[in-house]
Curated annotation (Swiss-Prot):
Subunit structure of this chain's protein: Part of the 30S ribosomal subunit. Contacts protein S5. The interaction surface between S4 and S5 is involved in control of translational fidelity.
Tagged with keyword Transmembrane: no
Sequence ranges assigned to domain S4 RNA-binding in this UniProt record: 106-158
The species this protein was found in: Pyrobaculum islandicum (strain DSM 4184 / JCM 9189 / GEO3)
Gene encoding the protein: rps4
Protein name per Swiss-Prot or TrEMBL: Small ribosomal subunit protein uS4
């Protein structure tokens, strides 16, 4: 009969422990500018997603080869379909070396800019938020939408 539960923040895994570390602040500022993020929470969300991937790869590495075999290929195929890795046959050690840029490169805002549909990364964000971008014929208004590899060439501008 109590009140509603407070929703859990999705970026806590990616939030740095020491937020006033000068080196970290400069690195975050550079990433926010390079990828046109609105605030650091978007960067922390990407870091949290990366942390989930690395944690899953680490747990697979800790298993015996017999336990790992049925779980490893689907995990790698999922990462390949999302575009985080270039080949589904890469070793798990390479997955551990992914960085946050791999996640940020798959955002709709970044892909719209990289394809040349926008003049700048900020223009790409505005196009997405205002509903001028469609992915596979469906309007997407979230610049943080992670575009799978098979939908990457189906991004179009709509009026």
């Amino acid at each position: 009969m109590g009140g509603l539960k407070k929703p859990k923040k999705k970026y806590l895994e990616g939030k740095p422990k020491k937020i006033w570390n000068k080196q970290l602040l400069l690195e975050e500022l550079q990433l926010v500018g390079e990828y046109g993020l609105r605030n650091k929470k978007e960067l922390w969300l990407a870091r949290a997603h990366l942390k989930w991937i690395v944690r899953r790869a680490r747990s697979l590495l800790s298993m015996t080869p017999e336990e790992r075999a049925p779980l490893e290929l689907p995990f790698k195929e999922k990462l390949y379909k999302m575009g985080f890795i270039e080949d589904p046959n890469v070793p798990l050690d390479r997955i551990l070396s992914l960085d946050v840029r791999a996640i940020l490169e798959r955002r709709l805002q970044t892909i719209v800019y990289r394809k040349g549909l926008a003049k700048s990364i900020y223009h790409a964000r505005q196009l997405v938020v205002h509903g001028h971008v469609a992915v596979a014929g469906r309007r997407v208004t979230s610049p943080g939408f992670l575009v799978p590899r098979d939908l990457e060439d189906k991004i179009t501008l709509i009026e």
